[in-house]
Amino acid sequence: MATLIRLFIHPVKSMRGIGLTHALADVSGLAFDRIFMITEPDGTFITARQFPQMVRFTPSPVHDGLHLTAPDGSSAYVRFADFATQDAPTEVWGTHFTARIAPDAINKWLSGFFSREVQLRWVGPQMTRRVKRHNTVPLSFADGYPYLLANEASLRDLQQRCPASVKMEQFRPNLVVSGASAWEEDRWKVIRIGDVVFDVVKPCSRCIFTTVSPEKGQKHPAGEPLKTLQSFRTAQDNGDVDFGQNLIARNSGVIRVGDEVEILATAPAKIYGAAAADDTANITQQPDANVDIDWQGQAFRGNNQQVLLEQLENQGIRIPYSCRAGICGSCRVQLLEGEVTPLKKSAMGDDGTILCCSCVPKTALKLAR
């Protein structure tokens, strides 16, 4: 029998999660889950994919707002009533909606921990975002779905294969189950926990975020556990690296640790295997040097040590991305002039394109979309 053994909410997207014994499960997700988010001033979302130290902030939801504790021990408090009353344009993964902006005082405090001006945003009294292809399902600041379920046995199987220590918190689930065999969740289509029925919509594709240590706020130097996942959990139909399942609730109710997870419907699982043959490039460390980078006519001084995606973002240049690990291909751009050091063989395309997340400038560059 499968059982719910852990419950998590993440009140602020990309910050530390909170374990619960019970929670209200609504169609939009668990109460207080990812209802706050850090953004650029223009509303573009910011996550620990870019700023790994975000996972060391501790959010504490209270009845009338949010208390935040930073890694240095300082703290701030904001009430729902203090947020702007006007809706502001906001974006997560290319979906555009509105949210409410926090007061200047807490935004200035938060900006001191980042290399840029940032804002805290709240979903507001009514969520304006919807799940793609599910237009009646409201969504918080979560990546794409209201719920993420993970299986303890699947984590154990991953740990047996992975040379690095792996914690469930690295995958940031809401619901953790035990009593099922490893990867059995791949076959689930409809489940019930307590009185709440969930549709299992799709597997959750994983990214560089899984390599961030929840305690240290640093990415694993060898890219684990994502590297190991790629070796046996790469979907053969689309190349996604999957761990866990995205869910949508059909109704509302309180769910509790210890509740039975009843499997109501199943379907054949996706086929998984290894990623393409060894993609690791031979890398020679370069002496520190500045390089000139031209992005579609916008020139700036960069360096030959940092991946191109991060350098472009530091200049306020928005490059689409998803995994930041050389898997999804979203950040591919045209290399018109110059040389780069690829961190993966697949980062260099035969058509003159490169993956920004997996290339470091070697000489002056000229780039375009």
Swiss-Prot record:
GO terms for molecular function: 2 iron, 2 sulfur cluster binding; catalytic activity; molybdenum ion binding; pyridoxal phosphate binding. Residues 289-369 form the 2Fe-2S ferredoxin-type domain. It holds the Pfam family MOSC. Residues 115-264 form the MOSC domain. Transmembrane segments: none annotated. GO terms for biological process: response to toxic substance; toxin catabolic process. It comes from Escherichia coli (strain K12). PROSITE patterns: 2FE2S_FER_1 (PS00197), 2FE2S_FER_2 (PS51085), MOSC (PS51340). It comes from the Bacteria. This is Uncharacterized protein YcbX. CDD domains: fer2 (cd00207). Gene3D superfamilies: 3.10.20.30.
